[in-house]
Amino acid sequence: ICLYLFKYMVNIIGPFHLAGRSSIKAMWQKSKNSFFITILPVIYNNLSVIVMSIIVSPLQLGFYYGAARIHRALNTLYGPVGQAFYPRLASTDSGNPEKAKQMTKKFLWIMTAAGFLFFSMIYFFTEPIIFLLLGEEFLFASTTLKIFAMVLPLTAISHVLGRQWLMIRRNDNQYAKILLISSIIGVVSIFILIRSYGILAIPISLIIYELLTIILILGFLKRAR
């Protein structure tokens, strides 16, 4: 199937050619901020897991991964929803910026409400969810999952403010800088917290990361008025 689709694509757009140095440089200048916006959260998460796997016991690591799987199942829903909304928002902004602003505000309320719904589901029904999805032996991860639940509404807010509004307003460079600052402080907070709090340090650092991202974005938007 892949070979057929590849051949079909080549028939439509023609054969592939390696880009020249000037073309590569131009593409990099145009897309580098989007690259950093995508890669920085991944680096932050991977560094967090590496640090934790070195310090905590394998048993604690297992509890962490159990709680993280439930958090990630809900957290990954934001991406597809945002991607579906982004083209319409971009199209509206090109012709009517004020309408795009109002649309973003409505989307922010919707995503925030969804975030608090996810938070309420996990926080108030932690043990039944763990028992159903992971098994009784993972009940020791209840506190970890409760803290992960607190991250969900914060992620919803930072997602709309950053990946929707700042990027629509062509503030990719500023957003990349904000994510870099938040990622560095998030990783540093793990080193500070992990000895005392173990696996709880990861969701706590995520709260710090998301809160700092939101505060920095709001500060930038206030200055840019």
PLM-predicted stretches and their roles:
Residues 33, 48-49, 62-78, 110, ...:
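Alpha-helical transmembrane segments of polytopic membrane transporters and translocases
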Residues 1-20, 81-84, 162-165, 173, ...:
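C-terminal transmembrane helix end/exit motif
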Residues 1, 60, 126, 131, ...:
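Membrane-interface helix-loop junctions in multi-pass transport and translocation proteins
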Residues 67, 71-95, 162-168:
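Helix-loop junctions and terminal segments of transmembrane helices
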Residues 152-178:
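Membrane-interface junctions at transmembrane-helix termini in multi-pass inner-membrane proteins
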Residues 124-153:
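Interfacial segments at transmembrane-helix termini and the short loops linking adjacent helices
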Residues 2-45, 88-102, 225:
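Interhelical loop/hinge segments that connect adjacent transmembrane helices in multipass membrane
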Residues 26-30, 34, 52-72, 139-143, ...:
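Interfacial/gating helices of multi-pass transporter permease domains
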